[in-house]
Every structure is written in structure tokens, then in C-alpha cells.
């Protein structure tokens, strides 16, 4: 019996509870490379099945990398040193640089929060989902808040990844540059959260798939993988 047939015969309440687990299982079994599956397995269990990002409490993710200290403080990467100097000179303050007094009314049809054609409501109507103009406006607002919430959660992951890279990288100029990346990601977290909190007044939970990526990066011992993941997020 396939999954679809099984879901069809289940009572509605039971189906709504077990459906996310079947979807999570499909995601995990879609990974064909056994090495990738093994590396993502623990994070997938914590994110997709246990839903550690949706329990309403801070999440503890064990780190396995080593912090690399160099007590001679060498100047060992001229390119990184140059990036560090540029990053210092280009710092900006999100609290001061952005005009937070700008009024944002997500329900104002005259100033849509996202383009009206961003969502194909005609396609939804083909499936029997018909919304009033007010419902369409609210739906666009909710979609925007959800997307920005995931950006925010991703930036928190990038913030922690940058901090871990700074600890684990083995050339000292890279650590100096990494410190500026930590500040950059902190600024992103600050700005995204403030916009969601003061303008949209809504924050969605972290997406399970995004949690898996963040969990896998945080617990990976390789600094270069953390650096790559930081750029992706």
C-alpha cells in the first residue's frame, strides 16, 4: 500500500497529525548519496521529526569543531587582511542608517507589501480557493511575514556559523575578517527582527527544512563547510 492510499483511509484528525511525518520521511528517502544521508540524518531527525525549532524554547545544538588559537598572531593571509580592513571601514548602523519612522501598513491596498501578481490567485481559484480582496491582502502580508521570518532565522544561523568559523579557521587574518562577518550577520538579525516586530507585528516559526540545514552546519566539525553554509544562508 502506498502512502497516498494509506492517507486516504485515515480519519481526518489522524491524517493531519501523521502527514508531516510522512512528508519528512519522503524528504529523507529522496537523498540518494549514503554519505550525505548519514551526515544529515541526525539533523533531519531533530528538525523534521522532533521539530526542535518549534517547541517554543531555545534550541541547544552540540558543536563538534575545535577552537584554534595561535599565540604568535601571524599576518598570514594578506587577502583576508585586506578584506578585514575594508570591512572595518564599511561598517554601518542599522538603527541610525535606516528610517524606522517610515509608516508601513501591510493592509493598505494602495501600497501593497509585495506586488499583487506575486501570487497567482487565478491558479488558486482553479483549485476552488477563492479569496475576497481583503483576504488576498492579508494572504500577501502573511506570505511576506513568513518569508522574512525564514530570512531572519537563516541570518541567526549565519551569525552563529560566522562565529564558529572565526573560532575554527586556522589562519589568523581569517579570524580577524571572520569577526567582521559576525558583526554583519548580527546587523542582519537586528534589522530583519525589528522590521517584523515593529512593522508587520508577526513572526513565524523556523521552517523544518531550514532548521535541518542550520543544525547540520552547527554540528559539523569542518570550518570550510560552515563557511560555505554561512554564504548560502
Language model region names:
Residues 151-159, 178-196, 231-232:
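Alpha-helical transition-metal enzyme core signature, strongest for iron centers
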Residues 136-140, 179, 233:
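Conserved short hydrophobic patches within well-ordered secondary structure
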Residues 1-163, 168-173, 198-205, 209, ...:
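Terminal targeting/low-complexity segments that flank the catalytic cores of oxidoreductases
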Residues 215-220:
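Active-site lining segments of carbohydrate-active enzymes
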Residues 210-214:
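Short linear capping/connector segments at secondary-structure termini
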Residues 224-233:
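Acidic/serine-rich, low-complexity amphipathic helices located in mid- to C-terminal regulatory regions
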Amino acid at each position: 500500500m502506498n502512502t497516498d492510499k494509506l492517507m486516504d483511509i485515515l480519519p481526518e484528525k489522524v491524517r493531519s497529525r501523521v502527514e508531516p511525518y510522512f512528508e519528512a520521511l519522503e524528504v529523507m528517502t529522496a537523498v540518494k548519496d549514503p554519505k550525505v544521508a548519514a551526515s544529515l540524518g541526525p539533523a533531519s531527525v531533530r528538525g523534521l521529526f522532533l521539530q526542535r525549532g518549534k517547541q517554543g524554547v531555545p534550541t541547544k545544538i552540540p558543536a563538534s569543531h575545535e577552537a584554534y588559537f595561535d599565540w604568535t598572531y601571524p599576518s598570514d593571509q594578506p587577502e583576508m587582511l585586506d578584506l578585514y580592513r575594508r570591512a572595518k571601514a564599511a561598517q554601518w548602523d542599522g538603527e541610525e542608517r535606516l528610517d524606522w519612522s517610515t509608516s508601513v501598513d501591510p493592509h493598505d491596498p494602495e501600497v501593497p507589501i509585495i506586488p499583487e501578481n506575486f501570487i497567482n490567485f487565478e491558479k488558486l481559484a482553479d483549485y476552488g480557493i477563492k479569496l475576497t480582496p481583503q483576504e488576498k491582502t492579508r494572504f500577501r502580508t502573511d506570505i511576506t511575514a513568513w518569508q522574512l521570518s525564514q530570512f531572519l532565522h537563516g541570518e541567526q544561523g549565519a551569525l552563529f556559523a560566522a562565529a564558529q568559523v572565526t573560532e575554527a579557521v586556522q589562519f589568523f587574518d581569517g579570524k580577524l575578517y571572520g569577526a567582521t562577518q559576525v558583526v554583519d550577520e548580527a546587523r542582519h538579525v537586528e534589522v530583519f527582527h525589528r522590521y517584523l516586530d515593529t512593522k508587520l507585528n508577526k513572526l513565524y516559526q523556523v521552517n523544518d527544512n531550514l532548521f535541518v540545514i542550520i543544525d547540520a552546519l552547527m554540528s559539523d566539525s569542518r570550518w570550510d563547510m560552515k563557511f560555505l553554509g554561512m554564504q548560502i544562508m
